[in-house]
Amino acid sequence: MSLAHYCLLLAIVTLLGLTNVVSATTAACLPANSRKNGMNVNFYQYSLRDSSTYSNAAYMAYGYASKTKLGSVGGQTDISIDYNIPCVSSSGTFPCPQEDLYGNWGCKGIGACSNNPIIAYWSTDLFGFYTTPTNVTLEMTGYFLPPQTGSYTFKFATVDDSAILSVGGSIAFECCAQEQPPITSTNFTINGIKPWNGSPPDNITGTVYMYAGFYYPMKIVYSNAVAWGTLPISVTLPDGTTVSDDFEGYVYTFDNNLSQPNCTIPDPSNYTVSTTITTTEPWTGTFTSTSTEMTTVTGTNGVPTDETVIVIRTPTTASTIITTTEPWNSTFTSTSTELTTVTGTNGVRTDETIIVIRTPTTATTAITTTEPWNSTFTSTSTELTTVTGTNGLPTDETIIVIRTPTTATTAMTTTQPWNDTFTSTSTELTTVTGTNGLPTDETIIVIRTPTTATTAMTTTQPWNDTFTSTSTELTTVTGTNGLPTDETIIVIRTPTTATTAMTTTQPWNDTFTSTSTEITTVTGTNGLPTDETIIVIRTPTTATTAMTTTQPWNDTFTSTSTEMTTVTGTNGLPTDETIIVIRTPTTATTAITTTEPWNSTFTSTSTEMTTVTGTNGLPTDETIIVIRTPTTATTAITTTQPWNDTFTSTSTEMTTVTGTNGLPTDETIIVIRTPTTATTAMTTTQPWNDTFTSTSTEITTVTGTNGLPTDETIIVIRTPTTATTAMTTTQPWNDTFTSTSTEMTTVTGTNGVPTDETVIVIRTPTSEGLISTTTEPWTGTFTSTSTEMTTVTGTNGQPTDETVIVIRTPTSEGLVTTTTEPWTGTFTSTSTEMTTITGTNGQPTDETVIIVKTPTTAISSSLSSSSGQITSFITSARPIITPFYPSNGTSVISSSVISSSDTSSLVISSSVTSSLVTSSPVISSSFISSPVISSTTTSASILSESSKSSVIPTSSSTSGSSESETGSASSASSSSSISSESPKSTYSSSSLPPVTSATTSQEITSSLPPVTTTKTSEQTTLVTVTSCESHVCTESISSAIVSTATVTVSGATTEYTTWCPISTTEITKQTTETTKQTKGTTEQTTETTKQTTVVTISSCESDVCSKTASPAIVSTSTATINGVTTEYTTWCPISTTESKQQTTLVTVTSCGSGVCSETTSPAIVSTATATVNDVVTVYSTWRPQTTNEQSVSSKMNSATSETTTNTGAAETTTSTGAAETKTVVTSSISRFNHAETQTASATDVIGHSSSVVSVSETGNTKSLTSSGLSTMSQQPRSTPASSMVGSSTASLEISTYAGSANSLLAGSGLSVFIASLLLAII
């Protein structure tokens, strides 16, 4: 093959590729549902600057639908695309056409552009949809309707970036399935897909042969990757006409109709579309008859087609006009239709219709009647009456009754715009239910006006035929009387091309004008036959007189009748003619409207029917309108009546009035009943005895005068007779935040219906804010404070427990809850007693009574702020009887809340909640008192039975205790309980890890007077034990250990005696009394023994507490001092869990009269820990295993403090002038990795020896040593051994109570125990 032939072949192949001529038959569609103008456009996401995806044919055919659909628009007829990116210049932002681009990035007429041309830009330039035209894929679908049969050539003048076009069913989309997902066909009519790294050629075309009148599916898919977007679309019709861009009238949209049969037309060439055939035939009737006939025609393809033939039959003879006008004596125009039968010249009977119009002979108003009524709107009703015409046929007449309100109101005529071409007036009937519950029909006249100017009922439409067609369409409108009315709409269809008129005028020899319609068939330019209508008007060649005859007669009205005569025309044929005979009365007559007075309160208009016999002997029905007016002036139908209720009642009553014609008429009367006295609306206020305002809603039923019940609502507000707070309640509570809760209460109103009321309770903390205490009055004689627990469900649906503190105060004078009592103690004691009172709500409430016991003797104290020393003097000291425990007993002590203050406003407080359990009969646990303090205080029993227990013994159960020394500013309060738990702080003798001990020796210089303490030997004696229960007392004799101790302070000697029963066996009655005279004060002590009971012991370690039940001996003792009797109760547990002990050797140094001796003795080491405010205290006790009774006298003189430390064996030497105590500890114990200083004396605790305790404080470091008891040290839990520092804030309260401890340390073993515990509490 030569090169020339090869090039020729290549050109042919290229031409065939660019020009895709569809030679095969293209499938068409005939959708049956309603069509819409334009095409649908769907938008899909496309990645910016993606230059490969749109090169894939599968993506352009259907793959785009898998991307994100951005939205869609419809009704698009201008389907070409021309998008220009914006150019941002110094003069503004303007779109820049691609052909105006120059240079690096400039636009002609605009200048240099500063923006980036290859980024995404948003706009509505593509069919009004807001998207990024720079990067998007869109799909256009619709049906192409060819106006001609032949070849249609579609063309893309250029493509930027990629596009395809498909035409035909099964190529673009299936028939009647436009909205379905795209099909997978890649048989494109135009393939404008941009090749990889290339550009598609310009002027790409595709040709499709289509048949006129069929719809062809068409789809266009376009993609743009960046910047400008261009796709100009055009089509060339078979006649050579080119349509570009705007495809108005060629593209349509149909909704999916997948169930439509025969939607697809595979071969339109074999499918015949038939037109309607109109045929005109002459006939012998006197009017034009139009009928529709259905025929089946077999087309050239052998397929039968249904055709519709309209047959118009026109009369062959002349006839007179069928409309007749007659005068009559009524007040309105009546139109009736009469049917007559005429025998034509051909002997065939023909039915003719004569329209008779009867007009009134006198001037009158129309049939519209206006009546006043008492409603608030205008009511228009239509009344139907039947009038029998002169021909004996009944005719329906309509009377419109307009009832206008006596007050201004809007009309009932509504005007609405609509999209049709004519004005429509319809009457709509609505039913309104009045206050009496009866429905009333109302008429609303709705006038719908076209949004564009148009003529009345004549509609003009364009069509593709060559002549003007006028057809009459009959519609039925249902009036307000419920009867259908036929309306006629004349539709004029005009050809879209110019044509000559079809009206022809011909002369003829008859006496009237004849108009007939003739059908001719004209073959159009498309080769199809078209039926045309020619209207032939035949006019008479000679003049003729009319057929109307007027005759006088003797009646009172004008009668018009039609008479039929037969006239032989000039053609020798008989013609039926109609003569209208008008008979007029010879005398004047009045109108038919009659006015009559009557006794009612309104104007009544009724229609009466009378029958009049005319001159022709035929009866004629006449209508007389009777207007009855009231004889006296009256208001409208609204009636006002007074009544005795407190509100205005409006009811609607329905009455029936029978008119003079005997027909009942429904009338509505509105009755307004007003109260005879002034009152507020429906709100009623009533007093009641509660403490809050209640608002309830009550429903009452009022029966109106018409006997119908009416529901009315009365709001009843009940206000308290006494002042009360609102529904917002403020209460204090012990938490740290303000709580607001909503409580729902249900109040049952007088109607028995419960009403929910809401009380807002605001609980505020008692500190740092307003106190929100709620005070309520009650009939009790004291103030009651109760704590109520409520559960409030929050907005998150979770329940929250809230505490409400309610303080109820007595409404009358009652006993004060604070009681003051004298006692023989040396300080003021405040105790709290708990009583249970059942409140008005039936719930028990704990009430607290504070009892203040004041000392009968004065105590003076002095504070030196420079040295921190406190000197306390008691002007009169008395022995205090302190019952001790049996040798095998144990003690359980719980103490809490210790506070102290001095006169210089220096407040030191600590909270302690502890439980101490030890197997030793004496608890060797202490805070060591300073030797510089000289004081004498009395000690009270640590244990007292109470729900919450008390350190201070009283004759009643107590809760809490406070102490204050009247001569100083120091005070302390504590609370203890036999069965008490607290996770905060515990004293426990349970097993402890080893605690490292060190020895400290120091000398304290003091200028205060020395304190001398003497401890005597104990002896056993018999005592009389008085046991009381339920106010019945018995006496018994029991063995007891008697211990005595004396303390001399500044020359004042105090002796302490303790009786401790050692047996609970009851014996013969015997009383042991001890009387001691000291400075004129007499004290008498009696100790009794009660039966054995069971107590609960709480043991706590590492914040874990457990309870055990143990039998205990209950011992009571009474002391009478200056006539004041105090009862002391002691519980001595018989057994308990023994703590882990260690046995070691200690060196006991005994000194007397300046001579000291040392002995070595085994000792039991007991340890206990206490946690107070996260400070861990370890207590160790060395108990020498010897029973030697010792008497120790210690004196404190001024000396120099000296401390030595021995790493081998801890040794502490305390020099006090004449007396010196040396203690050596050979064991080391450690706990919690904290170093603690422990010193132990060689004093035999069991032997109840005691010595002076010393306290030293320097800066913030505190070292405590004891020569007679165990020692301890304090540090926070987290303090390392190298930085253990005591709290300086404890110095004042330690020194305050050290004096009391010093005095007790010189006494008996129990006094030593009490002093140790007192110091430990500090």
From Swiss-Prot:
InterPro entries documented for this protein: Flocculin, Flocculin_t3_rpt, PA14/GLEYA, PA14_dom
Residues anchoring lipid (GPI-anchor amidated glycine): G1299
Membrane topology designation: Lipid-anchor; GPI-anchor
Sequence repeats: 278-322, 323-367, 368-412, 413-457, 458-502, 503-547, 548-592, 593-637, 638-682, 683-727, 728-772, 773-817, 818-862, 892-906, 907-921, 922-936, 1013-1063, 1085-1135, 1136-1186
Comp. bias regions, Low complexity: 773-795, 817-840, 950-1001, 1197-1221
Region of interest (13 X 45 AA approximate tandem repeats, Thr-rich), ranges: 278-862
SMART domains: PA14
Pfam family name, one: Flocculin_t3
Protein name per Swiss-Prot or TrEMBL: Flocculation protein FLO9
